[in-house]
A protein has these predicted regions:
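Class I Rossmann-like S-adenosyl-L-methionine
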Residues: 1-208
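Conserved hydrophobic/aromatic pocket- or pore-lining residues that grip, position, or stack substrates
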Residues: 133, 157, 219, 227, ...
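Glycine-centered loop/turn positions within well-structured domains
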Residues: 155, 225, 237
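Active-site-adjacent "gating/activation" loops or surface patches in catalytic cores
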Residues: 202, 217, 235
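Glycine-rich helix-loop-beta junction characteristic of Rossmann-like nucleotide cofactor-binding loops
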Residues: 209-210, 229-235
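Class I SAM-dependent methyltransferase Rossmann-like catalytic core
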Residues: 211-217
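Conserved class I S-adenosyl-L-methionine
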Residues: 236-243
Length: 245
């Protein structure tokens, strides 16, 4: 919510909003691993850096490692320009650290996933969480769980059944919505066994989309859709939602 507020106030277009959103969430998600890579090349450890320097280095490193669409020189130059506005004296330091990361990226990214500590660093989890998972599931399965959790989730839309016109089938309504989305250049696909679900790629801002604003679709994971189908609630059913957002 806070991020959306700032993005809307900044007046950015959808492409820039997407860039900022990935950067913010990516840094939060990968913070420990980013700090690990920065510490490999920096004489000053991350925990001893000024807040502005630490943040800009995380931003630059994330772009170098995780954003293939951003050229290395662009990530470095923009990071240097940003730190000049915040702390001009640190510009040469930020430049040197990011260039060292760029030059030796493969070596800097490498980490052997053979210990709890290294799993915690690479997947950016607190050590106690990884220890608990290993105790419960074993080392190999824990790595598989952490790897799965690190994947970017797909976006699924649930079509609202209450929008059906008299005599209209759900298949027809979903099909029309899919055609509408494809006409806007979005990649969409239906989901076998869940007729109200649509997988969509390239959707930047759902909250402003007419289909969302008019109540035809909402964003929902497949697991949540399956729960509702298994429950099969009736018109007079009383349902207690314990996981409401």
């Amino acid at each position: 919510m806070a991020l959306n507020k700032y993005l809307n106030e900044a007046g950015l277009d959808d492409q820039d909003k997407g860039f900022v959103t990935e950067l913010v969430y990516g840094i939060i998600e990968k913070k420990r691993y980013l700090d690990y890579m920065i510490n490999k090349v920096s004489k000053i450890k991350v925990r001893k850096m000024q807040h502005s320097v630490r943040l800009v280095l995380r931003m630059g490193t994330y772009q170098l490692v995780h954003m293939d669409g951003v050229a290395d020189y662009a990530a470095i130059n923009e990071s240097v320009n940003l730190i000049k506005k915040l702390d001009k004296r640190s510009a040469s330091f930020v430049n040197a650290v990011l260039r060292n990361i760029s030059r030796s990226l493969d070596d800097i990214k490498s980490i052997r996933l053979n210990t709890v500590d290294n799993l915690a660093i690479y997947y950016s989890y607190e050590k106690w969480i990884v220890e608990g998972l290993v105790k419960e599931y074993g080392f190999e399965r824990t790595e598989a769980i952490l790897s799965a959790l690190s994947q970017k989730p797909s976006i699924y839309l649930r079509v609202n059944r209450t929008k059906l016109r008299p005599g209209q089938s759900m298949d027809d309504l979903v099909g029309k919505i899919v055609e509408d989305l494809r006409g806007q250049g979005l990649e969409t696909s239906r989901i076998d066994g869940i007729e109200e679900a649509i997988k969509v790629k390239g959707l930047k801002s759902i909250d402003k989309h007419p289909l969302f604003r008019e109540g035809y679709v909402s964003v929902q994971d497949l697991s949540s859709m399956l729960v509702a189908r298994i429950m099969d609630p009736k018109r007079e059913s009383r349902v207690l939602d314990l996981c409401a957002a």
